[in-house]
């Protein structure tokens, strides 16, 4: 099914939910809460109720997740238009689970001011998935104190190390969701010299980003 925009998609969702034959509710007024997954939460470490201030913070970190956060913001705003004003919206972040990483795990070995001023550090992604897998593993083995290595395997792929307390202490993805494992169309770890080399060949930053994000990984090889 093709939709021209997010708002049109949410209209169809609302119609299905309230359909007289197979719907599960009579009116969209029965929808009290809507949850939105957002890839990059920046400074946020816990789920947040959507407010104008929260959306503004998500806009600030668009440069850190340019392929994901803009669509998330559009989706949030579309849902707010289609569903009643009384419906509360919440955001959960892929980066939040990894905020317990120690500094030795999240810092890059580059000049300090890039961290303090530009917030260049390893954030990690797929945190919602890693947290779920870790929790299910502990329940499955009836052991709340396991040390786990969790994997998220899809077109994007990542690993995380979780300690006995259920806190992430390291992960394979970093500043963006391109670092780490070889993925479907993303290159994963690559020598920074390759970036300089491609730049000298005349490729722009946008062209290099397109290659690394959409034309590499399993597709590339």
Please state what every model-predicted region is.
Residues 97-200:
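Glycine-rich phosphate-binding loop of actin/hexokinase-like ATP-binding domains
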Residues 57-75, 79, 117-121, 125, ...:
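A gly/proline- and charged-residue-enriched helix-loop-helix capping module
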Residues 17, 23-68, 88-90, 96-105:
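Short beta-strand-loop/turn "lid" adjacent to the catalytic site in phosphate-handling enzymes
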Residues 4-8, 53, 70-74, 124, ...:
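Conserved active-site and cofactor/substrate-binding residues in soluble primary-metabolism enzymes
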Residues 1-3, 174:
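Short glycine-rich, Thr/Ser-proximal phosphate-binding strand/loop in the N-terminal lobe
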Residues 75-89:
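A structural motif corresponding to the C-terminal end of an alpha-helix
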Residues 34, 94, 165-166, 212:
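Buried hydrophobic positions in well-ordered alpha/beta secondary-structure cores of metabolic enzymes
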Residues 200-221:
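A mobile "lid/hinge" subdomain adjacent to the ATP/sugar-phosphate binding pocket shared
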């Amino acid at each position: 099914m093709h939709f021209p925009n997010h708002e049109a998609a949410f209209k169809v969702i609302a119609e299905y939910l309230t359909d007289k034959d197979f719907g599960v509710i009579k009116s969209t007024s029965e929808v009290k809460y809507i949850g939105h997954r957002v890839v990059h939460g920046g400074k946020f470490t816990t789920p947040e109720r959507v407010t104008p201030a929260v959306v503004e913070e998500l806009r600030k970190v668009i440069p850190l997740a340019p392929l994901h956060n803009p669509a998330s913001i559009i989706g949030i705003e579309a849902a707010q238009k289609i569903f009643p004003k009384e419906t509360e919206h919440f955001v959960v972040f892929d980066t939040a689970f990894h905020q317990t990483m120690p500094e030795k795990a999240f810092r890059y070995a580059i000049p300090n001011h890039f961290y303090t001023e530009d917030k260049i550090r390893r954030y990690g992604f797929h945190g919602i998935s890693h947290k779920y897998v870790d929790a299910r593993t502990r329940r499955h083995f009836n052991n709340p104190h396991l040390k786990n290595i969790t994997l998220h395997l899809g077109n994007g792929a990542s690993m995380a190390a979780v300690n006995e307390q259920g806190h992430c202490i390291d992960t394979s993805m970093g500043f963006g969701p391109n670092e780490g494992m070889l993925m479907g169309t993303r290159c994963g770890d690559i020598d920074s010299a390759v970036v300089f080399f491609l730049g000298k060949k005349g490729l722009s930053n946008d062209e290099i980003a397109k290659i690394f994000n959409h034309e590499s990984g399993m597709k590339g090889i």
